[in-house]
Amino acid sequence: KGHPMGGYGGALKQLSIGIASSYGKAYIHGCGNPDEIWTANHDHFLEAMADAAKSIVDYFGGKIVYINIMKNMSVDCDCCAVAEDPCMKDIGILISTDPIAIDQACLDLVYQANDPGKKHLIERIESRNGVHTIEAALELGYGSRTYELIDITNE
């Protein structure tokens, strides 16, 4: 799904904003200064999400399984008061032990989709520099952009 600030909402967004308390959400959105919740530098916000996600990964010692459901994909997140209707057909469910790899795989599947609605979601992702969260997480060293897709629909 898309996200109004992060560009997309996947494992990294859920590890950071999704798990955070109200104060934690403000802290992340404000890049360490909750008083700047809506005025902080946008790329710094994406980096703060990657950093917050790392704290959860570190806390659990990597003992997390990530499940991204690519269904009812809209340019908006369910955190929006009124989200746009889905713009893409369902793609599937991805599972990984690497939050960076699963988010990269999801973005790749959106870009590769044979779906005219993808242009709306891609526009949201790119206009918010959404891939920067993946880049920042990779720089922090808690995952990889490399993955192997295994299709189990015919097994």
Q: Locations of the language-model features?
A:
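Extended, low-polarity segments enriched in aliphatic/aromatic residues
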Residues: K1-E155
